Amino acid sequence: MPISNKIYPRTGDTQTVYLKNVITNPNIKIGDYTMYNDFVNDPKGFEQNNVLYHYPINHDKLIIGIFCSIACGAKFLFNSANHSMSSLSTYPFPLFFEEWALDKKDVIKSWDNKGDIIVGNDVWIGYEAVIFAGVKIGDGAIIGTRAVVTKDVPPYTVVGGVPAKPIKKRFDDKTIDTLLDIRWWNWSDEKIALNLDAIQAGCVERIVEV
């Protein structure tokens, strides 16, 4: 059986990590077996290199589910990357509160707050994709290479482009409903192992109950 609390799941491969085991920020929550591969930087530096503008003052969260696959260079762009579009100027005056005799607690008025980034389970995020603040990605979705995701992605939907748009659904509606109902990623490791042939063959009819 696999061991979910190790850092490197593959012998001799230090470019791939189980992400949960290298995260220290309490505002980043990662599910078991979700992996990140990086052939440019140390994958253990995910917090610093891939989760951007994620400042404690916002209390915004990155939540990623179980069994996700995140490719090299994928980025999660948080609220502090924004500037306010509702004010007359996009210049972040509150950020320079000392210069302009403003109240320090109003720093967050420098940007529009879109909320957390939430990634479901069994999601594949492609090479150098960018996920914006406030986006929710459904279970089983695929994010294409260098896609810029500015809107929510439905479950089991493939998206790509700038900005990312739906390309196709991975399965028919009946199969998607079945997958969302059985939620295989919540099974025990033993039940997953028993059903790997069916999972890899894309055949829900062959699922074995235990």
Say what each PLM segment does.
Residues 16-83, 94-99, 106-166:
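Structural signal for interior beta-strand "rungs" in well-ordered beta-sheet cores
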